Amino acid sequence: MKQSFVKIRKITESPYSDIWAYPKGTKSQIKSRIKELENLGVESILFQGKLEINTINVLGKGYVGIVVLGKIGRKKIAVKIRRNDSPRKNLKKEAELLKIINKLKIGPELIASSKNFLVMEYLDGEKIGDWVGGLKKKGSSSQLKIIIKKVLEDCYLSLIHI
């Protein structure tokens, strides 16, 4: 079955609306977060990913937030949603850190942010842990060393060219 993006305004009923204020939120919180996300320019969401939360597929879930696939116009984006039970009161500090590393050409580009959301460039690809786990053939340790060296060089070069 082909999945399609759903307009944010239509994601107001459980179980999909539960993602806006995970793990538990009031109707008022959900409505407020939908408005907050619309103000950031996000138009639609696609619930896909290998991780499942209460029958809903997402790209990722962590201690602070949940990440889903979204769209602004025709551009796919990653949307980090602050969990209601997060020890952080907002995502402001994380947004500031992303802006700093973006100047060094590191990490996904931060497109927009608010108290409860980070809207970032969507980077499609294999998770690094899965990629490393898949390195079982001859010569893969040297391949891994080359990649790690390149990443570290890129980070260093970005730092000295500020």
Question: Over which residues does each language-model region extend?
Answer:
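Conserved small/polar residues in nucleotide/adenosyl-binding loops
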Residues: I160-I162
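Conserved N-terminal boundary motif of the eukaryotic protein kinase catalytic domain
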Residues: Q48-V58
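ATP-binding glycine-rich loop module of kinase domains
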Residues: N57-L91
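Juxta-kinase regulatory segment immediately upstream of eukaryotic protein kinase catalytic domains
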Residues: K2-K50
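Conserved structural core of kinase catalytic domains
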Residues: E109-L144
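A conserved alpha-helical element in kinase catalytic cores
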Residues: K80-S114
